[in-house]
């Protein structure tokens, strides 16, 4: 029986990936469709992906699939063909190709079965996730941005919005997608006569959000097909002005794709213009925050003097200090509302 999970250490896998000579292509895709047995589907896809040397993060549920992956360049078309042939619902599926890609986004394949491919917190039995808003293409997005009757709603987290967003887009002040959905409905109650345009990184969150808005009585709802990634790609291909400002945060080792030259965020330590996310080097912290090169050198990649001092201690002493301690030494917030308790790159489904 084939092994259907990874058994090699992360360090060894990362070293192996970095030693590869063949370029890789970072791809993301999702599809809402009924999967009768997600576990069986997961195991079959794991074997297919492994055979093509695909790395990345894949979630499956009864409601569909959500994937961010890295594929050897020579296998991209084979991967596309085999994915399309895997299930009739996947035939012709749009694959979002990364805009700013060094090929080092993932080094291991992790494929999990979950209750939902996006944690939405919706338990209304009458909610129809297929009753989504209308898709917008790049040219239509730009036209909507100039329409005084249109409101753009950013369905991403604060740390994503902070480094890049569409002109005049509204941020929904919440820590997770499940918290954003009811807040979006609440914030838009006074604007039901407006055209509501929703967007996210690759389309999966704003598609479900558009259905939720319609479920709650909003009739003029649109969402950007393929999210920021597809919008920027098509706008560039068609010679259109790219109206997204700054960087598009992505959930892999790159932590961002440069969309425009503007830097709209600031270093969380000194306030200098900067939009480079990093994780605190202290193994007892790993906070996601924005750090400029000057502060990275000053604090040795840590988020604070406390973490800098602790990370310089012998490993045994670091472990002793961490034992039984809540993450009370974290200085900055990943979001506006609470301290980050997630190590490493955030989960895009939250």
UniProtKB/Swiss-Prot annotation:
The entry's keywords: Oxidoreductase, tRNA processing
Gene Ontology MF terms: oxidoreductase activity, acting on paired donors, with incorporation or reduction of molecular oxygen
HAMAP family cross-referenced by the UniProt entry: TrhO (MF_00469)
Catalytic reaction equation(s): uridine(34) in tRNA + AH2 + O2 = 5-hydroxyuridine(34) in tRNA + A + H2O
EC number assigned by the record: 1.14.-.-
UniProt name for this protein: tRNA uridine(34) hydroxylase
Domain Rhodanese: 146-240
Function of the protein: Catalyzes oxygen-dependent 5-hydroxyuridine (ho5U) modification at position 34 in tRNAs, the first step in 5-carboxymethoxyuridine (cmo5U) biosynthesis. May be part of an alternate pathway, which is able to bypass cmo5U biogenesis in a subset of tRNAs under aerobic conditions.
Catalytic residues (UniProt): 200
Highest classification ranks of the organism: Bacteria, Pseudomonadati, Pseudomonadota, Gammaproteobacteria, Enterobacterales
Example GO BP: tRNA modification
Signal peptide: none
Family label: Belongs to the TrhO family.
Pfam family of the protein (one): Rhodanese_C
């Amino acid at each position: 029986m084939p092994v259907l999970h990874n058994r090699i250490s992360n360090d060894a896998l990362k070293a192996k990936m970095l030693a590869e000579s063949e370029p890789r292509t970072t791809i993301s895709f999702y599809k809402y469709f009924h999967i009768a047995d997600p576990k069986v589907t997961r195991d079959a896809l794991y074997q297919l992906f492994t055979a093509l040397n695909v790395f990345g993060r894949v979630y499956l549920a009864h409601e569909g699939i959500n994937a961010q992956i890295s594929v050897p360049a020579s296998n991209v078309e084979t991967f596309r063909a085999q994915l399309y042939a895997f299930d009739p619902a996947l035939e012709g599926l749009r694959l979002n190709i990364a805009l700013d890609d060094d090929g080092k986004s993932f080094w291991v394949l992790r494929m999990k079965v979950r209750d939902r491919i996006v944690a939405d917190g919706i338990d209304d039995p009458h909610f129809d996730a297929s009753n989504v808003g209308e898709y917008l293409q790049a040219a239509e997005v730009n036209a909507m941005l100039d329409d005084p009757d249109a409101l753009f709603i950013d369905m991403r987290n604060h740390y994503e919005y902070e480094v890049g967003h569409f002109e005049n887009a509204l941020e929904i002040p919440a820590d997770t997608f499940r918290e954003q959905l009811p807040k979006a409905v609440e914030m838009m109650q006074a604007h039901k006569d407006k055209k509501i345009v929703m967007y996210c990184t690759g389309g999966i969150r704003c598609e479900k959000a558009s259905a939720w808005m319609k479920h709650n009585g909003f009739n003029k709802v649109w969402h950007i097909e393929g999210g920021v990634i597809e919008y920027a790609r098509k706008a560039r291909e068609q010679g259109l002005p790219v109206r997204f400002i700054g960087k598009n945060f992505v959930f892999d080792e790159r932590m961002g794709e440069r969309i425009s030259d503007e830097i709209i965020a600031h270093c969380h330590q000194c306030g200098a213009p900067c939009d480079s996310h990093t994780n605190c080097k202290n193994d007892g912290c790993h906070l996601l925050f924005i750090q400029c090169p000057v502060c990275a050198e000053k604090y040795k990649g840590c988020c604070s003097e406390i973490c800098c001092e602790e990370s310089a201690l012998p490993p045994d002493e670091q472990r002793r200090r961490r034992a039984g301690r809540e993450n009370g030494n974290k200085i900055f917030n990943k979001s506006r509302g609470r301290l980050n308790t997630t190590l490493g790159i955030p989960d895009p489904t939250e």
